[in-house]
């Protein structure tokens, strides 16, 4: 018997075929686009190095919703629960502070062995892993400087941490058969008027060159660098600005990370993608939702998320853009936060794949901006939801909001027991 979903699917196929879109091909393309989920939503960026320590680096996780993960086993279980509710290919993005060891490990001494459980788990769940050195929430970052620190010994500590992190990243890629993107973000900056803005940037430039000096197989590891406008306590000066890292990534041919919350509120990273791609080999995206500042709210299916997805698809950047998420909301169920944000990113990618881009390009080239706008708006009403629901069914995930029932059941059975 034909189900309601199948009827809607058949009608959707016809509607999209009328504008030249093959929905089966769109779903095949969607399966080429993994989204890297960030582990730190699950525990408010606490990590396992010093879970009771305070979060520093000019970032904040606000809220106190019960049930956050307290160890790696709980975090992996929570991730599995979330991933069951998200269709299609996924990756996991880890920070160095999520290492596992029976004894304390200095950050400049981390090794692949401290992440072997994550690798075995990733293999079992058919996931790729990405990585980040953790240059925050540490006594040697307390004064607001790491890779650009004026003290040679402190700066060297962070250089060695990033070097060690690259080896961990390469281990991920070698073990899992898919390159790990390792992103370097540092909180370095000053609260008030800064007299010497040049010297810290000179030190950062030299430090980064030392960090990436060891040649690693690009099939296993990709270097990325990330800028930021400001952070709490670093409102007046950020060493790693957009101009600094754009220049660095261009001159060193690393990947450039664009975080949706790391620019002025009137700027959007969707407009930066095509410009950056002219100069850098690859991009890493941190899709987030800044509310007035880099607040890292859960990603919505809003105009900017859609614009980011459309830029990737319209310019066929599948093999040059790595899609990651970066938000941490401690005021709501953390598993639901993952599910909402990741599903929204995937919905945006699907909608972009269902766009009649070829026809729109023709109209634009012909100067018919009236028809361009009309088509862009009318396509929003095409039945993409039916295509999404079929995609979810094929991946054995809930199509609609019924996924929330599973989250609530898990919350009652598991999260509520954590105190």
UniProtKB/Swiss-Prot annotation:
Q: Identify the residues that bind Mn(2+).
A: 262, 294, 296
Kindly list the GO CC terms recorded for this protein. Answer: cytoplasm
Q: What is its EC number?
A: 5.3.1.14
Cross-referenced InterPro entries:
L-rhamnose_isomerase, Rhamnose_isomerase, Xyl_isomerase-like_sf
Q: Where in the cell is it found?
A: Cytoplasm
Tell me how the cofactor is bound: Binds 1 Mn(2+) ion per subunit.
Gene3D superfamilies attached to this UniProt entry: Divalent-metal-dependent TIM barrel enzymes
User: What is the predominant subcellular site recorded for this chain?
Assistant: cytoplasm
Quickly give the catalysed reaction.
L-rhamnopyranose = L-rhamnulose
Keywords carried by this UniProt record: Cytoplasm, Isomerase, Manganese, Metal-binding, Rhamnose metabolism
Q: Which GO terms describe its biological process?
A: L-lyxose metabolic process; rhamnose catabolic process
Essential cofactor(s): Mn(2+)
- GO molecular function per UniProt: L-rhamnose isomerase activity; manganese ion binding
Q: In which pathway does it act?
A: Carbohydrate degradation; L-rhamnose degradation; glycerone phosphate from L-rhamnose: step 1/3
* Recorded family membership: Belongs to the rhamnose isomerase family.
NCBIfam families listed in its UniProt record? PRK01076.1, rhaA
How does the annotation summarize its subunit structure?
A: Homotetramer.
Q: What does this protein do?
A: Catalyzes the interconversion of L-rhamnose and L-rhamnulose.
Matching entries from HAMAP family are given as: RhaA
Which protein are we looking at? Answer: L-rhamnose isomerase
């Amino acid at each position: 018997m034909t189900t309601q979903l199948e009827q809607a699917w058949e009608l959707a196929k016809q509607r999209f075929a009328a504008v030249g879109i093959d929905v089966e091909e769109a779903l095949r393309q969607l399966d080429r686009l993994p989204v890297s989920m960030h582990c730190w939503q699950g525990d408010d960026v606490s990590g396992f190095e010093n879970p009771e320590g305070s979060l520093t680096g000019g970032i904040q996780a606000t809220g106190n919703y019960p049930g956050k993960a307290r160890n790696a086993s709980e975090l992996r279980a929570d991730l599995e629960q979330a991933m069951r509710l998200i269709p299609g290919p996924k990756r996991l993005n880890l920070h160095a502070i999520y290492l596992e060891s029976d004894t304390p490990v200095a950050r400049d001494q981390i090794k692949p062995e401290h992440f072997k459980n994550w690798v075995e788990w990733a293999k079992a769940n058919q996931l790729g892993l990405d990585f980040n050195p953790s240059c925050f929430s540490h006594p040697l970052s307390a004064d607001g400087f790491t890779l650009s620190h004026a003290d040679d010994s402190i700066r060297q500590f962070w250089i060695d941490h990033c070097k060690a992190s690259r080896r961990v990243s390469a281990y991920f890629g070698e073990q899992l058969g898919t390159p790990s993107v390792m992103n370097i973000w540092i909180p370095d900056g000053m609260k008030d008027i800064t007299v010497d803005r040049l010297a810290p940037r000179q030190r950062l430039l030299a430090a980064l060159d030392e960090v990436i000096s060891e040649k690693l197989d690009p099939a296993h590891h990709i270097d990325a660098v990330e800028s930021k406008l400001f952070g709490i306590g670093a409102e007046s000066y950020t060493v790693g600005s957009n101009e600094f890292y754009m220049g660095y990534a261009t001159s060193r041919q690393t990947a450039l990370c664009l975080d949706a919350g790391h620019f002025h509120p009137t700027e959007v990273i969707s407009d930066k993608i095509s410009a950056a791609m002219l100069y850098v080999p690859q991009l890493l995206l941190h899709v987030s939702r800044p509310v007035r500042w880099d607040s890292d709210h859960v990603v919505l299916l809003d105009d900017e998320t859609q614009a980011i997805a459309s830029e990737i698809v319209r310019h066929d950047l599948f093999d040059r853009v790595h899609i990651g998420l970066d938000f941490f909301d401690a005021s709501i169920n953390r598993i639901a936060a993952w599910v909402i944000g990741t599903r929204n990113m995937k919905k945006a990618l699907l909608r972009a794949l269902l766009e009649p881009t070829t026809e729109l390009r023709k109209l634009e080239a012909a100067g018919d901006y009236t028809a361009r706008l009309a088509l862009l708006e009318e396509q929003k009403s095409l039945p993409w939801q039916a295509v999404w629901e079929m995609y979810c069914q094929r991946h054995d995930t809930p199509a609609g909001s019924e996924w929330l029932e599973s989250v609530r059941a898990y919350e009652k059975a598991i999260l509520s027991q954590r105190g």
